[in-house]
């Protein structure tokens, strides 16, 4: 009783000595800790010199007791119900397929604010540090709920697009179609139909069917009186709620078993299903492979027209090859091989027909108004014209009057064109690559002949004009 009679001197002595207040504890502990300071204060008043040399002993703080006190402070905070509600929403968003939207939490916040205002309850406590902790915790859970909503939307979008892709590429008719007759063909007796008596008499047969690693169990109720139609089976599977069962049917290990298996079931072999799916997925590759062989006529017409329009330089660039491939719906390799063969089978006979006598190496050309019948560079023709004085003299028939060149008559040109068209008509130019040793030898011989022609032209005083004849020859 004497200890509680004089609280004022004790508070004044604590204020002068700047002793920190004891931590928050329960009332029994506070009474127990409050007694030693009062005794110490009484000693301090009676003997001040003794207390100056010895410090005041502080009571040890139990970490477990401090943790429990902090927990009770969080539980008693006014914002704790809102924090609990948000935490439960985050758990619901991660447990089920239906994610809790952030808009619903906004409604919950409004309801919480109205309830606090109606009950005249505060939103914060006397501890600013604890208030800041609660607000930050609510913000973190709010951000977490938003991220869960985004992830759920992405998952739903991916599933919808994947299911749509499966429905378009794996049609039911293609899935069960078997041209050679498979184990699940309607005309084959290998369909294992389990009768009603067998299922009723042997309850273990159901587990044997469901655990069979060689097949996929499909409800027989989806079939219409024995007519196997995968469209009905597929619709039954989708309408049953298991949207991912078609994906499981593709695998060789997984099985699709409905929850309520009917009395009759049909068993489909996984190996045959995988075989049909593989052939279905490789259908596009087979179509592309079927293009090898005879090329379409419209494609050859487009490439032949380009060839005759560029007789001066019948070597398309990479961009021109891509453009021609896009127009003809062919591959770049087919276009490249066609031009390789065309230069040998179409243009080479034209050159041979224009030069019937192989003895003279120097070739004569016609006038400039027919450049499409030339298969030589412009620099050689320009050099010869400059040698004759800049203005070529023409004969009455229109040919250039040059002694060292042989004239290209219209009869020879017509004969060459006919021979080239007949060769092109007989051979379809299938685009297959024919890079053998004979082709390489022919190209080397053509290059040697062109080099010899250039040397002979240089001997006829054409070399002083600085001709560059190798830039346009390949």
Curated annotation (Swiss-Prot):
InterPro entries (UniProt xref): HD (IPR001356), Homeodomain-like_sf (IPR009057), KN_HD (IPR008422), PKNOX/Meis_N (IPR032453), TALE_homeobox (IPR050224)
SUPFAM superfamilies: Homeodomain-like
UniProt source species: Mus musculus (Mouse)
GO CC, any one term: microtubule cytoskeleton
Biased composition (Polar residues): 26-38
Protein name per the record: Homeobox protein PKNOX2
Residues covered by region (Disordered): 1-42, 351-371, 385-405, 423-474
Underlying gene: Pknox2
SMART domains xrefs: HOX
Coiled coil regions in record: none
